[in-house]
Amino acid sequence: MNERIAILSAYSFVNIIEPANLIPKFLLIGKKKYIRGTILLANEGFNCSFSGSYENVNLVLKQLIELTGSKDVNVKINYSSVHPFQKLKVRLKKEIIAMNVKDLNIEVFKGDYIEPKDWDEFITKQNVIVIDTRNEYEIDIGTFKSAINPRTETFKQFPAWVQQNQALLQGKKIAMFCTGGIRCEKSTSLLKSIGYNEVYHLKGGILQYLEDTHNKNNLWQGKCFVFDDRRAIMDDLSPAEGYWLHR
């Protein structure tokens, strides 16, 4: 019988003074706790996804919270029969999710969360436009019905798309979504900072939506791209056939 592997994804925007100093600590902790995956550290916070036993992934998360001083962490856990990562990587980055917009104050400019249970009703209202903030290769295999595809190759291209599509956005309620929520923290903050008032995002992203709602209204169509060896999951969160790497 295969061991049940926990996959923990978490992010937090928190001021880390010397993030480079944490790299050897988490490499050591991860090795001791048999953790595989990726931990990204930057002055603006941390973004991670790693796998191991349920007890060990939570112990590593606890260390992340304690050593960074974070008080607001977005966390998701799901499960697999095998590790979806090959090894542990701890990296220093300029941004924990790269959008390349200077001086974006996520604490001051925040979009409003829409809970997964309320998402279907909200996005089918009049005067609401739905934007998929992910990249085109992700959107190609699955997205929400009627969602706008900005056709970006990287998230750094999203601000330019916003500038080029102001006529589309003006006067609308703007609902955005991404895989796990972190890109929407920045995309909604960007829109709020340049004057859009009614800006919303799916709390916990697609992954939390699928877990909570089971896609009961079939508004999600296709598969969800994920950044690990599974590469894609179905709407019941099981790995999609034919996408696994390194099997």
UniProtKB/Swiss-Prot annotation:
Residue ranges occupied by any Rhodanese domain in the UniProt entry: 124-218
InterPro entries: Rhodanese-like_dom (IPR001763), Rhodanese-like_dom_sf (IPR036873), TrhO (IPR020936), TRHO_N (IPR040503)
Keywords: Oxidoreductase, tRNA processing
CDD domains (UniProt xref): RHOD_YceA
Reactions it catalyzes: uridine(34) in tRNA + AH2 + O2 = 5-hydroxyuridine(34) in tRNA + A + H2O
PROSITE patterns tied to this protein: RHODANESE_3
Pfam families assigned: Rhodanese, UPF0176_N
Enzyme class: oxidoreductase
Keyword Hydrolase part of the UniProt annotation: no
Active site (record annotation): C178 (cysteine persulfide intermediate)
GO BP field: tRNA modification
Enzyme Commission numbers on file: 1.14.-.-
GO molecular function terms listed in the Swiss-Prot or TrEMBL record: oxidoreductase activity, acting on paired donors, with incorporation or reduction of molecular oxygen
Record-linked HAMAP family: TrhO
Family: Belongs to the TrhO family.
Function per UniProt: Catalyzes oxygen-dependent 5-hydroxyuridine (ho5U) modification at position 34 in tRNAs.
NCBIfam families: PRK01415.1
Listed name of the protein: tRNA uridine(34) hydroxylase
Gene this protein is translated from: trhO
